[in-house]
Each structure stands twice: as C-alpha cells, then as structure tokens.
Amino acid sequence: MNLSHEEEENSLSLSKFESMLKTNKVFFFDSEEFEDIILHYMDTGRLNLAKKALKLGLEQHPKSTGLKLVQVEMLVYEDKLDIAEKLLNELYAIEPTNEEIYIQKANIHSKRDEHEKAIEFLKIALKYTDDYADVYSMIGMEYLFMDNLELAKENFIKCLDEDTEDYSALYNVVYCFDFLDQNEEAIVYLNKFIDKNPYSEVAWHQLGRQYYALKNYEKAVWAFEYATLIDESFLGAIMEKAKSYEKLKKFQEAIDCYKIAIELDDPSSFVLLRMAKCYERLGNAEFALNFYLKTVHEDPLLDKGWIAITDFYIRQKNYQKALYYVNKAIGIDGDNPLYWKRFAAVNSALHFFEEAEYGYRKAFESGDVNLDTFTLWTDVLQFLGEFETAIEILLEATNLFPEEYEIEYRLAGLYFLSNENIKGNFHLNNGLRLNYKNKTVLKDYFPVVWERTEVQNQIAKFKK
C-alpha cells in the first residue's frame, strides 16, 4: 500500500511518539505533529494516549492555540462542556477570527441540544473559514437534528457546490429528498450533479435508487449500469441492478448480476436466495432447489431460506417435503404467524386436519387476524365436527370484520348444522344482504345445509 507524503509523516510521528513512551526519553515535536497524534488517538478510541500526547504537547508548546483547540475537542468528547466553554472564551479573546473557535462553540451547543445556537456560531465560522464545505455540512447536520429537512438539504447542497467529492453530504442530500418524498426533485438534482461530475459512481447509484423508488426499473438499470461501469466492484449498484432486472422479469440478467456479486464477495444467503427464486421463475426447478439448499447451508438459521424451500415444494405439490421444511422454519422463528399458516395449509393438503387446526390456532395466537385465517381455521374445525368452537371463533371475528359475507354464510351453515335454525336464518339473511351473488359460499362449504328446503325458500324469498 502506497502512503501519501502526509500519511507517511504522520506514521513516523506516531512511531517516534510511541518509542518515546517506551523509553521514557523526551523527544521534541512541533505543535502540528502533536495535533495529528492526539486526533489520531481520539479517532481510534485510545483516549489515555491522546491525553498523554496533549499533556506533553502543552508542556512543549504552552501558547499553541491549535493544541488548546484540540484540548477543547477532547473536553467536548468527554462531555466536560463548561470547562471547554471557558477555555474557548479565553481563546476567543486572543484569536477572535479563528473559525475553529466558533466550530467548537457550535459543537458545545449541539451537545446541549441547542441546535439553533449551534447554527448561529457555524454561520459566524463561515466568515473566517477556507473550508466552506465542512461548515455547510455541519450546518446541514444541525438542521437534521432539528428535523428541518428542507434547510438541511439546502446546506448539504451548498457543501457539494464547494466539494463535489463529499460523498457523506451527497448521501445526506438524498436522505433529505427521500424523507420529503421528493423522488422527482432528487432525480433533477442528481442529473445536474452528474452533468458536472459524470464519473461519480455514487451519484449514478443514488440516481438509480430514485428511479427504482418510482418503479421506473428500466431507468434504474440504466443508472446502475453507469455506476458499475465506473466502478466494476461497486457491489451495492450490482445488487440493485439485479433487483431491478427482477422487477422487469429479466431473471437471467438478474442471475448474471448476482453471479458477479458472488465473485466480488463471499456468497451471502441473500444472494443465493435471490438466485434460487430467479431460477424458479425461469422454470429451472433443479437449479432453483440447488440454490435454495445452498442458501440454508450458508445460513442454517435463516428462516426465510427454509420457508422458501417450503413454498417451492408446495408449488411442486410435494407436501411431505414441504412439511419437513416448514418445521425447520418454525424451529427458528416459532412466533411467525406466516410460518404457522403455511404449516396449517400443508397439513390440510395432507389431510392432517387436527395438525392443521393447531397451525391456524398458533397463527392467530402469534398475531395473524386476517380474514382468511379465521375462515380457513373454522373450515377445518367444521370438518372435525367442532361446530361450537368454530362458531365462537367466527363470532369473535365479527368484531374485526362486522360486515363480512364470508363470515355470515359460514355462521349460517354452522348454526343450521347445530340445529339452531333461528340463528341460522339470521346469519343467512345477513349474508344475502351483504353479498347475494356469493351465496354459493354456503353451497360450497355446507352442501347439506344448502339443499334444505327451508334454506332455499329463504333465498328465494330474499330475491323477491
């Protein structure tokens, strides 16, 4: 790895300083060297070494404003804000045009959640700084803390006007556009940015994300393609290009992208799972199953992998294998209602109705209150002859679905089967009132009830 001249000097200074600590000899460093050493240790979380360097630095350079400002930064880092503020006031009396004094004052107010005051000091710093980009970025962050996304966006854009390579600011601009649901505006801005910086792979990638959000998948692929042409190893752009191809139902192209992703990085369970789904959509069941199995081999605790294999076997109508794999998924996440629902459906297909009833019950207990959960559950209970329990569940469901014909027709059928004809007629009338056309629900699920003369008379009477 080639180091820049500045990095090489910093490395030598660090080696010299650490050698001094080991030998107890005292070496001389200029104040800027000390600043770099201290900031390096702070950035790497070695605060004790930073403090040692600061102490020695101030002994050798007691009047250094730069070192005292680093001291302020350290005090702010340790939440010693009052001491830091006092020291800043002393420095202000000496150097009132030093932008770093205002930046550190802003940091103190920001730490106190006084973001408007922080912005005031940062605006003063703008008068004295040469690094406008950095200050605009800090102002943008303060506005973010205040949830003022418009002004945050405005300042991040100003930062990028000064420094087009500040990718942190670019991400923040896009974050603001996203949060404000301004995808179209984001596209306009990013296109202008790209006109000036055509080789910014990050900008192309963000442009692709905006097109994807607007479901313009052709344009998304186009933008991601440019990002990957500029940087062939841009994994994020490659992955999102693959997702866009999937949306366009271009599954082979998506697979090709995922293959590149695997070459660049160790195969993740997510990539393997996506490839499996693409192969299945192409009708290649053998490759699909192979990649589903690779998915769970890569991450045995990925419940989505096991459930994907379950769904694969359900589509193949191989319910015995589907049952094996859905049990694997439930073993990992036993509180997922969707898994219990599949468990129930698979057991129903295998005519294991008691197990199916247990599955729907567990789905409900895990938070599934969808209409079809109640109807499927009670259909199984009806088959098991548990009419009373089925009625109780459907009556509970009417609290969530008070005007639902599927529930009313089922209640009618169950009450008639239980010889509670008055209640049966009441719910039959409700069903006919809510949806006369779909009265065949009663015929499909309760054929014996449907053929009753009393029921046919009631239907004929309602039609009149």
Walk through the language-model features, giving the residues of each:
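Canonical positions in the second alpha-helix
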Residues: 57, 90-91, 124-125, 158-159, ...
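Register position in tetratricopeptide repeats
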Residues: 43, 77, 111, 145, ...
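TPR/TPR-like (Sel1-like) alpha-helical repeat modules
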Residues: 365, 413-440, 463
